[in-house]
Structure formats: C-alpha cells, structure tokens
C-alpha cells in the first residue's frame, strides 16, 4: 500500500497540474479570440 502522505502529494500535484493546463488553455483561447476579433 502507498503511504497516505505520498498519495496525497501525488494527488495534489496531479490536481495542480490539471488546473494549470486548464488555465493556460483558457488564457490562450481568450487571447486567440481577442486577436481574431
């Protein structure tokens, strides 16, 4: 079994990475729309 602390760190890193990707994609999407309009 994986230690709770290790699993918590892994889950936290995955969540932060996913959030960062979503934010970056959203900002790029808005930036692209601003340039197109």
Swiss-Prot record:
One of its GO terms (molecular function) is electron transporter, transferring electrons within cytochrome b6/f complex of photosystem II activity. Keywords: Chloroplast, Electron transport, Membrane, Photosynthesis, Plastid, Thylakoid, Transmembrane, Transmembrane helix, Transport. It comes from the Eukaryota. The chain crosses the membrane at residues 5-25. One of its GO terms (cellular component) is chloroplast thylakoid membrane. The keyword Nuclease does not apply. HAMAP family: Cytb6_f_PetG. Component of the cytochrome b6-f complex, which mediates electron transfer between photosystem II (PSII) and photosystem I (PSI), cyclic electron flow around PSI, and state transitions. PetG is required for either the stability or assembly of the cytochrome b6-f complex. Belongs to the PetG family. The 4 large subunits of the cytochrome b6-f complex are cytochrome b6, subunit IV (17 kDa polypeptide, PetD), cytochrome f and the Rieske protein, while the 4 small subunits are PetG, PetL, PetM and PetN. The complex functions as a dimer. This is Cytochrome b6-f complex subunit 5. The gene is petG.
């Amino acid at each position: 079994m994986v230690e709770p602390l290790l699993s918590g760190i892994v889950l936290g890193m995955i969540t932060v990475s996913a959030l960062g990707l979503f934010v970056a994609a959203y900002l790029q999407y808005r930036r692209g729309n601003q340039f197109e309009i």
